[in-house]
């Protein structure tokens, strides 16, 4: 079955909910059992209720480990990934920090991409040292062999990196990690399983901000982790011990969003490519940081891993503009909203202050002010027209009026 068909059907068993096309939303804190023995068996992963179909013995004695609605979504995510088992988390950042805390203990050392999501970097800088974990931030375009220490337990990868969108040499990182028995975790939110499957390349853990493309409608916050074998068992034990709980209604919405993922991603990619090519030719743009563009320095590496590109990229303007000037540019846009997320239906734009981001890749000679762009589902010509008008407002001589 092709991926677009799997997306529509994944995680749903019509016979389980009396022929209804859509699974019900279960609002229940308690699971009832016919006998005490049935309860004990459920706690040991042998429930009489068939709600988890990934073949792993999971506790189903109390709904803090998930209602059927939660498990329908986790089943669907594992099906789409094509391997492994899935766990659902309250947010993408929760999933990131949870993965780190599972595999990084006091006295251990972790490697994290220099251009990772800034909230992850903040967690690594502010929280991990308190727990006795040493952190090294690495350049994703360079050889990491010399950065490995005897106590390195985890390598975090992001595909591609946040804001600057560098592509990591994933096969190199995985090879080094396996030689030293180090766990690898890949944040694959930008690509989704449609464009790249981390587990197929030997990565131990695939991680997603379901908030973004997977759910796709800007109406929930959620994360997910997919792994297999002993790695999954370690994650699952921590999952139970930390008491991670997810709301059933959010899982229903995310599961519904998955069914249109293929169509949405195709639209995001086509629109982003059209907009990016137009921006490449604009006199006020020094660089377009979108690896799908043929002239991107890592285009060939990108092609070797990814089936396509999503709708999120950055641009570097021709010079550094003041905060007031950037406000003048984006405050008056008609279609693009000013927002920190991406992956929904609506296009978003956000100036990025490089000086506030303490990472070396941001110090590279990309040009002037950074702006991140997410192309939603609107018409590409309308988006180009909106961007053209916004760029025409630079430089803003009268920032009070924006004219």
Curated annotation (Swiss-Prot):
Pyridoxal 5'-phosphate binds at residues 62-64, 92-93, 209-211. The keyword Isomerase applies. GO terms for biological process: L-cysteine catabolic process to pyruvate; peptidoglycan biosynthetic process; regulation of cell shape; transsulfuration. One of its GO terms (molecular function) is cysteine-S-conjugate beta-lyase activity. InterPro entries: Cys/Met-Metab_PyrdxlP-dep_enz (IPR000277), Cys_b_lyase_bac (IPR006233), PyrdxlP-dep_Trfase (IPR015424), PyrdxlP-dep_Trfase_major (IPR015421), PyrdxlP-dep_Trfase_small (IPR015422). The modification N6-(pyridoxal phosphate)lysine is found at residue 212. It comes from the Bacteria. Pathway: Cell wall biogenesis; peptidoglycan biosynthesis. Its cofactor is pyridoxal 5'-phosphate. It holds the Pfam family Cys_Met_Meta_PP. It catalyses: L-alanine = D-alanine; L-glutamate = D-glutamate; L,L-cystathionine + H2O = L-homocysteine + pyruvate + NH4(+). Its EC number is 5.1.1.1, 5.1.1.3. It is an enzyme of class 5 (isomerase). Keywords: Cell shape, Isomerase, Lyase, Peptidoglycan synthesis, Pyridoxal phosphate. PANTHER family: CYSTATHIONINE BETA-LYASE-RELATED. Belongs to the trans-sulfuration enzymes family. Catalyzes the racemization of L-alanine to D-alanine, and of L-glutamate to D-glutamate. The activity is low, but likely physiological since W.pipientis wMel lacks canonical alr and murI genes, while D-alanine and D-glutamate are essential components of peptidoglycan. Homotetramer; dimer of active dimers. This is L-alanine/L-glutamate racemase. It comes from Wolbachia pipientis wMel. The gene is aar.
């Amino acid at each position: 079955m092709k991926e677009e068909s799997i997306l529509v059907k994944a995680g749903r068993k019509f016979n389980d909910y009396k022929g209804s096309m859509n699974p019900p939303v279960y609002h229940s804190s308690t699971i009832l059992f016919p006998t005490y023995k049935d309860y004990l068996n459920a706690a040991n992963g042998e429930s009489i209720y068939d709600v988890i179909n990934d073949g792993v013995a999971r506790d189903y004695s109390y709904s803090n480990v998930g209602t059927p609605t939660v498990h329908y979504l986790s089943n669907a995510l594992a099906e789409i990934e094509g391997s492994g088992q899935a766990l659902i988390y309250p947010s993408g950042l929760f999933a990131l920090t949870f993965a780190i805390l599972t595999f990084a203990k006091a006295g251990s050392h972790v490697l994290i991409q220099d251009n990772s999501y800034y909230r992850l970097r903040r967690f690594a800088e502010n929280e991990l040292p308190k727990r006795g974990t040493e952190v090294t931030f690495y350049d994703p375009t360079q050889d990491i062999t010399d950065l490995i220490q005897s106590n390195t337990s985890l390598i975090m990868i992001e595909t591609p990196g946040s804001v600057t969108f560098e592509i990591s040499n994933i096969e190199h990182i995985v090879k080094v990690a396996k030689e030293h028995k180090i766990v690898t975790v890949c944040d694959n939110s930008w690509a989704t399983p449609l464009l790249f499957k981390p587990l197929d390349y030997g990565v131990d853990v695939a991680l997603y901000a379901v908030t973004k493309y997977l759910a796709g409608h800007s109406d929930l916050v959620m994360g997910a982790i997919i792994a297999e074998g002993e790695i999954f068992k370690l994650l699952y034990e921590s999952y139970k011990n930390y008491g991670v709980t997810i709301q059933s209604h959010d899982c229903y919405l995310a599961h519904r969003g998955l069914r249109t993922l293929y169509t949405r991603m195709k639209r995001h990619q086509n629109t982003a490519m059209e907009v990016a090519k137009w921006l490449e030719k604009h006199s006020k743009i020094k660089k377009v940081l979108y690896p799908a563009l043929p002239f991107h320095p890592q285009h060939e590496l990108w092609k070797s891993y990814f089936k396509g590109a999503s709708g999120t990229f950055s641009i570097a303007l021709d010079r550094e503009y003041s905060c007031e000037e950037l406000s003048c540019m984006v405050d008056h846009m008609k279609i693009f909203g000013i927002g920190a997320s991406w992956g929904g239906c609506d296009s978003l734009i956000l100036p990025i202050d490089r000086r506030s981001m303490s990472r070396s890749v941001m110090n590279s000679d990309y040009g002037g002010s950074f702006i991140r762009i997410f192309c939603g589902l609107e018409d590409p010509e309308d988006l180009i027209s909106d961007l053209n008008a916004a760029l025409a407002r630079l430089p803003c001589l009268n920032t009070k009026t924006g004219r």
